[in-house]
Every structure is written in structure tokens, then in C-alpha cells.
Amino acid sequence: MIKKLTTAILALFSISVMASAEVINVKPPKGDATQVLNAALRKASKAKGPVEIRLAPGTYNLSKEKSLVRYYRVSNTASETEHKTADKHIGLLLKNLKHVTINGDGKATLLTHGEMTPWVIDSCTDIRLTGLTVDAADPSVPEMTVIERTDNSILAKVNERSRYEIRDGKLYWKGFGWEFTDGIAQLFSPAKGTNLRCNSPVALAVKVEEVTPGTLRFSYSGNAPACAPGETFQMRHAIRSEVAGLVNRSTDVTLSGIRFKFMGNFGVVSQLSKKITIEKITCWADSATNRTAVGFADFFQVSSCGGLVRFDNCRFGSAHDDPINIHGTHLKITEINGNKLTARYMHHQTFGFLGFTEGDTVSVTDPATLLPVGYFVVGSARMTDERNTEITMEGFRPVEGAKVPASLKGMIVENRTWCPTVSITNSYFSLIPTRGILVTTWRPVVIRDNRFVKCPMAAILIADDGRSWFESGAVENVTISGNVFEQCSNPVISIAPENVLSDAGYVHRNITVTDNTFISDRPVRIGVRSVDGFTFSGNRARTISGTPQELLFDISSSANVTLGQNR
């Protein structure tokens, strides 16, 4: 039986050799494609040079029950209490590979069945995924569109890809191996061009009835949730048990020309990796299925990476959190003995991976002021459990003029080696419930020639904190130029480190905002806090009709601020 199965798998791909690379041609099987695709990857691992795996047009079904199960702790995902295991159910596992391209030529679809991780790139070099569509047969963000609303009821049509069951008057959303009720909700309004968080129409209902198959009536003891006919409720649970893709401890990875129709149960996460290129990506709802939601949370999370992280020519719409979030991680020093310290992951959703290696440069920072008190080089590092890392310090150097405490216990540490240079260009952000971009890295950041439409929070947020999300760190060189901000909430750009203000110094430095256009029906606000060196010049503020709009600035605890000629 095994021999017959192997023969059947081999029949679905062929191998040819070109001048530049070996080519493995793969055809979509009738059933699950997991074995076929991973057999091609095993073939690629034996090649002596570059390999291109070409996927023939069609749908490649990836089912959770046939998936490869591997243990991965991933930044900003489910905690130990939210989800007991870190097992990921993986469709394609790229492990210890070099110089491999997977090319769908724009006509191959990876279709997941069940909550799972479509692909993982782990400990690889020079990997390229291109020309693919990624979707789910059972999206874990069910949807229903409002037909009618009365004072105390809603009549809604369930999307064709959303399955449900009513038990004892309660609605349960269902998929392959998953179900939930109540949950978190957003409301997509095609008339307003918004996709905003709201109260769950399921959680508030006292009764749910099936009027006809796929048509539900929700009854409420008080007022029905605000909505209008034609608007769509998007609902989800909050457990980030899987991701839409993982780049782990890899170098030179490119995602190009990929259409994400659904990303669950979190976005694509890159962690402890270098040189990441994300280009020509489309995260946009599939009109063919009348769906309106693409993301379960963030689209792209970049955590503790290095080298150049580049986003270019992407289109982002219908997320359930930030499209792009780039940050490091602060760990808290809980024990110190001589030159050995224990650093602990503090946020419940980020832990379980070793974030330090020999030779890395680490900053020691006061969590209240977010100002560094010193630096050291890692002599050795090992995890004693999934929360705690034992680090040997070499050559601690105090920051000149800093108040170094008698004990470093209670301070926070950031790995300065694993902080990327960032470029985000020529991209479009719309139908977002939160921010467009959140970025914190000390290396240069360029955000240029993008368009942000109706972000209900800051279109661009530069934060840094050591007591809530523990997402680091301070920026030192940021350029925001040539962008268009259309009807975004205030402050449109927010520099907002979560520090206790101190006369000791400023958290962020050298932020330049030039040649941008702000379009708004109300005065435009820019928020600046704890920055040394902020320049805002050559920008334009307009009303929707094109007349001049007022520019307002909320500036506190900052120095060397230049507000040049803006119009």
C-alpha cells in the first residue's frame, strides 16, 4: 500500500533541469495535497543548486487532519492558558532548505480546511514564494449580512462559506474541527467604506431563530446593535492558535505576488529572521464568495528580525488588526547574580523562543522612562523554561550620564542586534479597524508613497513600551514622505511611547515628516511625545473639496522640533 501511494505521489510531479535551476513540476491531486507538496520539498532538499517548484494551475487542498504537526512558539499568538499546546498544523514545511522557489504562476491556490498554518519557512536561506492564492474553505471569521433591522431585532443572511448550528436558542459558528459562539465582531459598511469593531450581535442576542436555511433572526431584550441593511457583521474568537504563515530563523525570504483571500488565525509572522521582502501582496476580500473579511487579526507581524525588511506595492484591506506591525521584544530582568541574569517574557502572548545568541548586543532600559542605562554583549544564553532565559553578560557599558541602579533587577532588555531596517513603499491601506502601520526599531525606517484611507486610529503609530505589550523599542531615524492620508482619525501620525516622562531624556529621535498630503473633513492633528528631533515640513492639508484644512499639533516633552512651511 505504501509503495502504491508513493508511486501515485511521484506521478503528480516531474523533474527537469534548466540552465539556472532544477525545476520540479507539481500537479494538484484530487484529494489532499499535503503529501504531494512536501514530497516535492524533500526532492528539492536533495538538489545541489537552486530549485523551482512549479505548481500547475488548480486548487491544492490542505486539510488539518492530513497536516504536518510541529511545535512552534510564535510571537504575539496564543498564551499557555488560551491554548494548551503550541502545535501548528502545517501544510507546507520548508525546513533547512536553500535556494528554493515555489511558483504558482498566479493560478495555483492553497486552500485550507480547518484552522491551520498553510506554510512554515524554518532555518532556510534564499526562499521565494510567488504567484499563489491562499484561502480557506471554512474561514474562521464567519459573516452575515443585514437584511433588516428593527428596534429589537436583526434579520441577516449568512455567507455561503459560513456554517452554523443553533442549540437551545444559541448560535454556534462551525468549521472543520472548530466552533465558537459570541466572540469579537466588526461591521463592514460598503456605503461608508469602513470596517470597524462593534458589539457582537450574537453575544447580545437573547434568541436566535432560523427563518429559512441561511437566514437568521436575532432578538434582543433592548436595542438591537446599530447596523443597516447591506452591512456585514464579521465575527471571530480570539485564540491565535495558528498563523497564516511563519518565517522562523531564516535569511533572504521573499513573498511576492501572493493573493491572500483569508488569513487565519493570525497573520504572517516573521521572527528572528533577516532580509525579508514582501512585495506585490494583495490582502483583499473575495467578491466571488461575497466575503468581506480577510484577516483574523494582523496581516504581517515582524518580531525581532534583522537586515532589511521591505514592503512594496502591496494592497491591504479588511484586516481585524494592524496590517503591518514591526517591533522587538522587551524582557524583564527578574534575577541577577554577578554577570548572570534571568530575563523573562512578560506579555502572555509572546514567549517560548530563544531571542539571544552569543555576540548579540543588548540594551538595558528603565521600563518607566524607556531610556537605556547600559549595554552588554551576550556571552551565552539558554532558556530554563518557556518564559525565562538565563543570559551571561560580557562587558556591561553604562550610558554616559544615565542613572544606573544599584541592581539591574526590574530593568528590561532588548536585543539590539535583532532590529531591522524598514522600508514600506507604494502600498494601500483601507478597511482597517485599527492602525495602518505600527513600527518600532532603532535602525532606519522609510515610509514613502503609501495611501491610508479611513484608519480609525493613527495611520502610523510609533510606540515603544515596557509595561503592557512589551514591544520595543526606540526609533532613531524615521522618514515619512510622499504619503496620502485620507479621512483618517486623529492623531493621524502618533509618536506615543508609553513612558513616564522624565527630565533624563527623550525616547525617540530624528523623525522627519515631509511632502505628505492629508485629506480630512476636520482639522488634522499630529501627536508628538518624547522626541528629540522632529521635523514637519512641506506637507499639505486639504478638505475633501480641496480647500485648505487646519493642521494642529499636540507636542509634549520634546526638543528640537521644526514645523516648517506647510500648506
Stretch-by-stretch model annotation:
Residues K64, T112-P118, D138-P142, E242-A244, ...:
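Short glycine/acidic-rich loop motifs that flank beta-strands on beta-rich extracellular proteins
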Residues T7-S16:
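Bacterial N-terminal signal peptides
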Residues R42-K43, N61-T101, L111-T130, D138-L155, ...:
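Extracellular beta-strand-rich solenoid/capping regions of secreted or surface-exposed proteins
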Residues N195-S241, Y375, R382-V422, S430:
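Small/polar beta-strand repeat architecture
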Residues N25-R54:
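Acidic Gly/Asp/Thr-rich repetitive segments characteristic of extracellular carbohydrate-active
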Residues A136-D138, N159-V211, F351-E386:
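Ser/Thr/Gly-rich low-complexity blocks that favor extended beta-strand/coil architectures
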Residues V51-I53, Y60, L92, V100, ...:
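Solenoid scaffold repeats with emphasis on beta-solenoid/beta-helix
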